[in-house]
Amino acid sequence: MKLLEFLKRERKKSASVAKERLQIIVAHQRGQRDQPDYMPMLEKELLEVIRRYVQVDQDAINISLDRDNDCSVLELNVTLPRDE
């Protein structure tokens, strides 16, 4: 009985899955398009400076630039390793 239910269930069509994935990619690229040209270089240089003092991975640093009307905020988050 379970086998029949499994075979009869409605599956997502590959087109709808592809559409969802494409929407995620487009939204991500639109978010990056609004950032200044210097952001990738700034992120790289900040990571190099932090690595002089603490060993961190590339994905341990997150930089975001938020803009509200006439104010811009540069936010830097670094996940530091635990001392052992």
Curated annotation (Swiss-Prot):
Domain of life where this protein originates: Bacteria
Alphabetized InterPro entries for the sequence: MinE (IPR005527), MinE_sf (IPR036707)
A GO biological-process term: cell division
Keywords carried by this UniProt record: Cell cycle, Cell division
Pfam family, one: MinE
Keyword Cell division attributed: yes
Family according to the record: Belongs to the MinE family.
Function recorded in the entry: Prevents the cell division inhibition by proteins MinC and MinD at internal division sites while permitting inhibition at polar sites. This ensures cell division at the proper site by restricting the formation of a division septum at the midpoint of the long axis of the cell.
Descriptive protein name: Cell division topological specificity factor
Organism encoding this protein: Chromohalobacter salexigens (strain ATCC BAA-138 / DSM 3043 / CIP 106854 / NCIMB 13768 / 1H11)
The organism's taxonomic lineage, starting at the top: Bacteria, Pseudomonadati, Pseudomonadota, Gammaproteobacteria, Oceanospirillales
